[in-house]
């Protein structure tokens, strides 16, 4: 496998993860009215917010 193929596969994997994350975000938004889940969502938000900042920085560097 050459480098192009390797990176194509890696980016395809990353895309799948981001698509799944988008679906989870939609679920979290729809469930925010449930107070029993709020604390868990806060934890998830903190973790995901760190990830989003990294992705935004990456996008800005490559544009």
Which residue ranges define each predicted feature?
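Non-heme di-metal
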Residues: 1-63
């Amino acid at each position: 496998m050459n480098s192009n193929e390797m990176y194509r596969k890696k980016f395809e994997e990353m895309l799948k993860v981001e698509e799944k994350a988008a679906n989870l975000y939609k679920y979290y938004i729809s469930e925010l009215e449930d107070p029993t889940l709020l604390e868990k969502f806060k934890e998830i938000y903190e973790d995901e917010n760190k990830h989003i900042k990294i992705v935004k920085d990456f996008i800005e560097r490559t544009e």
